[in-house]
Amino acid sequence: MEKNFALVDLHLHLDGSLSLDSVKELAALQDIEIPDNDKELLEKLQVREGCRDLNEYLEKFDFPCSLMQTPVGINTAVRNLEAELAAQGLIYAEIRFAPQLHLQKGMNQSEVVAAAVKGMGQSTLKSTLILCCMRGKDNHEANLETIRVAKEFLGKGVGAVDLAGAEALFPTADFEDLFVLAKELGIPYTIHAGEADGPESVYKALEFGAKRIGHGVRSLEDGALIQRLAAEGITLELCPTSNLNTSMFESYEVYPLRKLMEAAVKVTVNTDNMTVSNTTVAEELKHLALSKEEMHLMAKNAVEASFTDAETKEWLKEEVEKRFL
């Protein structure tokens, strides 16, 4: 990785990206007992080799979530993550999390987001929050509340909403009303689709009006869908190591990034969960053996698709070009 090259991460989950140091600080701040050796601690945070699927992968989120149930826990986690991303050379990141998963100690969703916003902007990193609705069967009201809270903070730290969780168990088709509301309120959105479920999930996300798709790699199972993604300029938020972790692909060599590029689909390279998958954006780009020109294209695509304001987007575009020269 060339020094000072512009790095961007559009698909980064807060709860899956708490570093070991951050976890220790959060535990100490809140008097929470955690394993006293790093090996045991990492076992609670990182996915094991031989992970079966996305559902097993998602089990790694309960422990870090338990450390972010207070205002100080959340704003410290965001502050630390932004500092770590800046140190890695990122110029911009979109950090996503589900406010409804942080209510165990009395906060409401608005208070959760306010705490996260308080942790932003304390490093050189430019950032935006994406609030995740969660796939499930008993949380419809909580999801609607997430949309309403996103509107409350839109342009004040929050840039968009998302739908995350166990895609194969809770199909995208079941969540249309969330995006009807988001559209009515003028909130941009991305949708996790085409990861654990097939092309039909991506078709539904497009039907709901999504201009960005989280993962989306199973779109390759449907040639007509690939043509549509290219024609409509839909951006895919690819997360290679995460997809290898969940047994979607056997190796980076067969990961379909270039196949998608050859089909004129806009793609970006992201981490998904830095700690769960033990990765960084720089490592993702290295694994894929991208040329300097290809890395430049990934950064340009990411900035163009970002959920930030026009002024920040222009600054990011200039920074990407300046660092490419």
What are these regions (language model features)?
Residues M1-I187, A196-S201, E207, K211-R212, ...:
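Metal-cofactor-binding active-site regions of metalloenzymes
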Residues Y189-I191:
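Conserved hydrophobic beta-strand within the GNAT/NAT acetyltransferase core sheet
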